[in-house]
Amino acid sequence: MSAEALHARPGRVRLALLGGAGGTALLLAALLVLPQAREILAAGWLIGLLFWLGIALGALVLLATHALTGGQWGRALWPALAPAAASLPLFLLLILPLVVGLGTLYPWAPDPEHAARSIVAQRYLNLPGATLRGLVALAVWSALALLLVGMRAGGLRQMVAALGLVFHMVAITLLGFDWVQSLEPHFHSTSFGMASLVLQLMACLAWATRLRPTPSEAAPDVGGMLLAAVLGSLYLGFSQYLVIWYGNLPEKVEWYVLRQHWGWLSLELLALLLSSLLPLVVLLPSAVRGSPAALAQLAPWLLGGILLHQAWLVAPGAGFWTLPVAALAVLAVGGLWFGLAYGLIAGRFIRATEAGA
């Protein structure tokens, strides 16, 4: 695979960087003009960060999986996966606005030793600890991604891949609580980390098939993985809801009660339709799963549904105006990420190897 093949079109890269810079400038202007809206701005940035970071982490997991299992799908998706995974160090910078906004976004941040909270929660949920966990996880993810992209096939690369998958599952479980579940500090779900992992895989597969149409010989594998991710997402989401409903746990029910107010329920139903029900129906026929064109056409709907789901997770606590702010944040984070990942990184930092091996 040549380095040139990893480049996005130059015009697309410039447009992405321009959009990212413009979105960032608008958000910064809003912060200066409306300092009282810090919570809304932080929540919007978190939504954009979760969406694009999810694609990059999905690429890391797929590269690690392919290093262990092999297959045509990895070779076919390599030009899209490698720049996305190698871009993970960028998120050490993109996370900084969230770090600055931690104190306004999370209810536990102003008073980490509130008497109503358990000793364990007081020791775990605090600004230094949450910041350190986030930065360490991003640093390790970045190192793993650069190793997987740069190393040749062999036992050492497989060992890195195996250790990376174990670390990722632990890290995404912890950060899923830190960044999302702790928006309501009394809520926690042991399946949230796995659900996040499945969404990352789904988002990255959709992104890769849209960015670079899958060759016909690899399309059935990619379509099968997409269908498995859709089924996994449906199962984990429903089982979490069922356990909480059946257990009648008031502190956990509050999470769902808040997200059924205003139009939040409609938002999640639309997300469910786009990211789960529609793809499930479309991908059931094997002819569709094996069609590169069909997968590429389905991808935007999947990505849109995943983005709406991220908004449903984060936005209700901050209010309706988080949604337009989130749209700007998606443009800002995504523009900067895409422009740098598929321009600078794809051209300069990714070594030409066969199938990333």
Residue ranges and their predicted role:
Residues 3-31, 121-271, 288, 292:
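Long, contiguous internal "core" modules enriched in hydrophobic/ aromatic residues
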Residues 261-313:
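Extended, compositionally biased non-globular segments
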Residues 189-196, 251-274, 315-346:
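Membrane-interface transmembrane-helix boundary segments in multi-pass integral membrane proteins
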Residues 94-106, 236-243, 308-313:
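C-terminal TM-helix exit segments that contain a strictly Trp-centered aromatic cap at the helix terminus
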Residues 53-64, 92-98, 134-146, 198-212, ...:
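Hydrophobic cores of alpha-helical transmembrane segments in multi-pass inner/ER membrane proteins
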Residues 31-40, 178-186, 311-318:
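Juxtamembrane "helix-exit" motif on the non-cytosolic side of transmembrane helices
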Residues 2-56, 122, 338-357:
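N-terminal regions that are enriched for targeting/export leaders
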Residues 49-154:
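Transmembrane-helix bundle segments that line or gate the permeation/cavity pathway
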